[in-house]
Amino acid sequence: MVQVENEYGSYGNDREYLRALKGFWDKSGLEVPLYTADGATPYMLEAGSIPGAAIGLDPGTNDKDFAEAERLARGVPVFCSELYPGWLTHWGEPWARVKTEEFLPDLRWLLENGKSFSLYMFHGGTNFGFTAGANFSDKYQPDVTSYDYDAPLDEAGRPTPKYAAIRDLLARFQPRGAKLPDLPEPLPVLTVPTVEFAETAPVFDHLPQPIRRPQPGPMESYGQSSGFILYRTKLWGRRSGKLVVTDLHDYATVFADGRYLGAIDRTKGETSLDIPKGEPALETLDILVEAMGRINYGPLLIDRKGITDRVTLNNMTLMGWEVYPLPMDEEFLGRLRFGRREPERPGNFFRGVFELHALGDTYLDLSGWKKGVVWVNGHNLGRYWEIGPQKRLFCPAPYLKFGRNEIVVFDLLVLRPAHVAGFADFE
């Protein structure tokens, strides 16, 4: 099956758009059933479903849910496209957990009533690199790097007690005499001794050629979709006072003449900080912005990153910007020049090495660091942040190698590197 859209009925009602998507798949030569997926409420199903496509319910766990969808079905199947054994987690919040005893009754109802279903998620996995998403309710809520999701298989693909409970329930609905297959042997895991970081590369020493614009502009206007971006301007007229970054997306560290002044955090609803008077008067303002994750559900899907509106200082609009896109991709990392030096200001890459004589999955502990991104042998493991709840990043065995391995940490806030060690477990 191929899904035409995902919960579109929650925030859109463009029938032509849905028909165009279905037409695309009809003409593609892919001869499989199509379906839509929406919440089990009348307006969502009416706006999100389309004739000729099966209807998926997110979730569908009772007669009322299915009756509402079948009213619109016009002869196509109805099924539960997302049954939630777990849930996602945002930075700064407790781990989202769904108790097994709360989830199993819904699964049992679907089985007893002969309904088709899909578990979301059966195996959660990881938001590697910059792929983590975000939500927005009353505030911006970026997702943590882990997409473990409290799923039946954990982030490393290992069965959990929740998996065992689901397996036991499914076994009761097997044909007489049928036997579930044995579980495979667990994948190897390993620990990594403490890694020291002896080399540093300041991000401000590795800026590309600037792009000059009157106003800052979102990173998409510079051909960039993720990572970081630096905005620099000369201060004329106003040189101190209240700095306001209108519509910041998503996290900024602010510097004046190279001195760190503080951070502005979209998750807290922050838009400003105070710039003190300097002696002599301050001349250069730097705003380094991190794109933390795009909103992927609801009416705010257009989530441009960087500085998406103007910047003011005591109500004076600051003009004349130099913009430095910092995608922090493979090409960018390949140009870093590491050396043994003490950083003068926050915003630095730190490099360490370690040796391995065996391979396996591991979890790298970043609890001593502040906020940033980690690469292992060039593979971007994702973001970490001291506010938690996630403190360890999953590193799968294929990212590691026998012999020498390299870790690069980019931290927005620390001047002195902490340590990193690998553990066999998530917590």
Question: Language-model segments: which ranges?
Answer:
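C-terminal functional regions that serve as terminal interaction/effector modules
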Residues: 291-292, 300, 370-386, 401-427
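Short, surface-exposed tryptophan/glycine-enriched loops
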Residues: 169, 272-284, 349-350, 355-357, ...
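Carbohydrate-binding surfaces of carbohydrate-active enzymes
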Residues: 3, 14-18, 22, 30-31, ...
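Mature extracytoplasmic enzyme cores
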Residues: 1-13, 172, 176, 343, ...
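Aromatic-rich membrane-interfacial microdomains
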Residues: 264-270, 382-393
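Aromatic-lined ligand-binding clefts that engage carbohydrates, nucleic acids, or primary amines
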Residues: 241-255, 354-377, 384-385, 407-410
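Short beta-strands within extracellular/lumenal beta-sheet-rich domains
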Residues: 225-234, 344-357, 393
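Substrate-binding/catalytic cleft of secreted carbohydrate-active enzymes
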Residues: 1-119
